[in-house]
Amino acid sequence: MLAPKRVKWRRVHKAVAKLNKGRSKAGNEVVFGDYGLQALEPAFITDRQIEAARVAMTRFIKRGGKVWIKIFPHKALTRKPAEVRMGSGKGAPEVWVAVVKPGRILFELAGVDEETAQEAMRLAAHKLPIKCKFVKREKAVTPAAAETGGEANEG
């Protein structure tokens, strides 16, 4: 499972209020691959959920294509044992989560056709606790294409 190698603080504030504010500022475009899976809701996604989604995608695409995981579980959520009285400190770190805001690209995929990518992303989305959508990489306009009018004027 995914987890940081070392952290400065083992126990951190939950900060759920911050999670529900606004959209993702970074990581909201497909950069490495041709297709991506974009989050539509805010959530904490656990290391196990990320791994389950990755396995679902890689099993479907078999040996073709490459998968990039664009999120990492940096935050530790703590939990106290069952039937323990209130107080006496914060519980032990139980699970590692990635803080995901709407608009964040969770996974990227390249080297497969669009139909295969869409089905692989659909299978991955079923393993996650949030609504997601399939997105394609936007073609960057090169300076040479911008001068001549680009692809829109061809034909």
From Swiss-Prot:
GO terms for molecular function: rRNA binding; structural constituent of ribosome; tRNA binding. Signal peptide: none annotated. GO terms for cellular component: cytosolic large ribosomal subunit. Pfam families: Ribosomal_L16. The keyword 4Fe-4S does not apply. GO terms for biological process: translation. InterPro entries: Ribosomal_uL16, Ribosomal_uL16_bact-type, Ribosomal_uL16_CS, Ribosomal_uL16_dom, Ribosomal_uL16_sf. Keywords: Ribonucleoprotein, Ribosomal protein, RNA-binding, rRNA-binding, tRNA-binding. HAMAP family: Ribosomal_uL16. Binds 23S rRNA and is also seen to make contacts with the A and possibly P site tRNAs. PANTHER family: 50S/60S RIBOSOMAL PROTEIN L16 (PTHR12220), LARGE RIBOSOMAL SUBUNIT PROTEIN UL16M (PTHR12220:SF13). Belongs to the universal ribosomal protein uL16 family. Part of the 50S ribosomal subunit. This is Large ribosomal subunit protein uL16. It comes from Symbiobacterium thermophilum (strain DSM 24528 / JCM 14929 / IAM 14863 / T).
